[in-house]
Amino acid sequence: MKIITTPDGRLREKSEKVRKIDDEIRGIIADMRKLSLDWEAEHPYELSAAMAAPQMGVLKRIIIIRDDMEDKKNASFTALINPEVIRTEGRVKRDYEGCLSVPSIYGMVPRATKVKVKAMLEDGTEVRIKATDELARTLLHEIDHLNGVLFIDHIRDEEDAFYKMNDKGDLIPVEDYEKEIRDNDELWGEE
């Protein structure tokens, strides 16, 4: 298994609902955790906060969310199966987002600051999650993946919303929006 990146068309497909949590599903979740941490090990300035199954080319409605997004040493993730946004609330705030499947590009993406999500845990327990701020943003980003939506889709026409990371780990605005973003077939694929 590996993390797939743009322009892979599977990132644009809608994922199917998980009908039964079995060894196959648990194996997918284990692979997601491993791939997230492997990616993080190769990116010293970044933290792998979450991942969706489509990012490995598996079109199942499964996401994993890091239990502590402030502590890179804490490598535990919670799996959410069939997560569904019940409602968003609060103000819409712009903040930085990146994605394992969109290499080297970051964006200032508008998202609701509060979200309520229902899902199942790996053991089949149904949960409802009220999330705010960074966790709300992360949940919305990952659930977008399950619907074939990438963070770049929310800001596609906003020239000043795109960033790259320099070799010191700082985010800097992209220099040539047309070339690096708008007309970049590697980013958007065939349309």
Describe the residue ranges of each PLM region.
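Positively charged
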Residues: 1-191
